[in-house]
């Protein structure tokens, strides 16, 4: 008897599974806030140098009380080509001759300027406090803003590897509960971090815990339901991410202080940690790891909650042992990474899929992590991005059932590249058009990544699917980490990061054409199925999986 058949007897999607799924997805909505928290906590406010004549509160009316604030600003701060005050320079001495001029120096030499040696003054009308104002992450220190985002994404990459291994060894529930506690502690501490170094270190740990929670949530949901409900469950977890992004925009609009926002995002994880004690461990994991008594206990609990009255009679150790035999035989058929890469077709597929995930993830995170570079209203952008990814997740099942995998991904990536490159030529004043292009690009990226994930599961045989997915997932996390660092290049050329994002989107759309088409093809079970692909392609079409 297969384990899926055993779950059918327990109840493939009964009250037990629904309650566990609802709790886990509700928790994930809050956890997903962490992935884009820096869009608000690290918002760069308008700023200028602190100058004695303007900002010294001990001098009543700024001493020369007959002059307006605008006049004092004109003689203290040089103006740029757009006639706006420079953000990182000030005059060494007040330029009184500029009072009756428009900030220019006709027929005269440029006066001496200096960096903002006394600090900065910020326009705090949008946010009273961010990590930028807390540690002056502007001008020469502005790249540290991107470093904070990079370290969070790097933490997600490390967490995927470390906690994935720990989850296989110590159980889904134990690692999930530990990750809730870790995120609660480091997130709360980050709100009161004394230095940017401490803050970045805590955000790295928060990234590791966040990715661990996301992965183990999916595992606990999928390993408790039968195969026919997996696609629906995964779609719901993706929708939870979108809802999390929408609610983040709303919460950040209400809570403008960085410290309070950090606390609101992190403190609920203490509650999640306490409530998670009532979650059920994966019975599949318990059985495979030689804990049949505990596995049987969890199965009987699930059966009782699903309304099965004679669970003890049906779910016996003899039945469980027959299930264990098949599951353990499948678990023992493992291949090392070197063995996988020595198989030409497997190696080629893993390499191409890894690049596609890497190249498609870069522009997605490039858009979603840098809202301030796209428009002035970051709250609206955050909400729109969440809404369009939610729509993409709802459209994904239809697209997967009616469109070619390769063609759909190519068109979506080309649409994404078009939006990214078009943003370069749209001036900042045309906010509506920039928002429309960015939102359309995020929708295309989200739908393209979903299609890529489905094709990945259809191209890799079941026996090595978990290991191969781990490899491609690492490349996706690397892409997300690099996307945040690439924005540092905007210091040298504002269009350069968007050009790079667009190029990667185009490359992703081209490389996917090198992969076989998998729509209406049966899922592969063994490596031999891949080697015999030419023969299998002649078989009658079967319904494809959306997993």
UniProtKB/Swiss-Prot annotation:
The chain crosses the membrane at residues 10-30, 146-166, 178-198, 205-225, 235-255, 260-280, 350-370, 378-398, 407-427, 435-455, 471-491, 495-515. Disulfide bonds: none annotated. GO terms for cellular component: membrane. Residues 1-9, 167-177, 226-234, 281-349, 399-406, 456-470, 516-547 are cytoplasmic. One of its GO terms (biological process) is organic anion transport. It holds the Pfam family MFS_1. InterPro entries: MFS, MFS_dom, MFS_trans_sf. Keywords: Glycoprotein, Membrane, Transmembrane, Transmembrane helix, Transport. Residues 31-145, 199-204, 256-259, 371-377, 428-434, 492-494 are extracellular. PROSITE patterns: MFS (PS50850). Glycans are attached at residues 56, 102. It is found in: Membrane. Belongs to the major facilitator (TC 2.A.1) superfamily. Organic cation transporter (TC 2.A.1.19) family. This is Solute carrier family 22 member 25. It comes from Homo sapiens. The lineage of its organism: Eukaryota, Metazoa, Chordata, Craniata, Vertebrata.
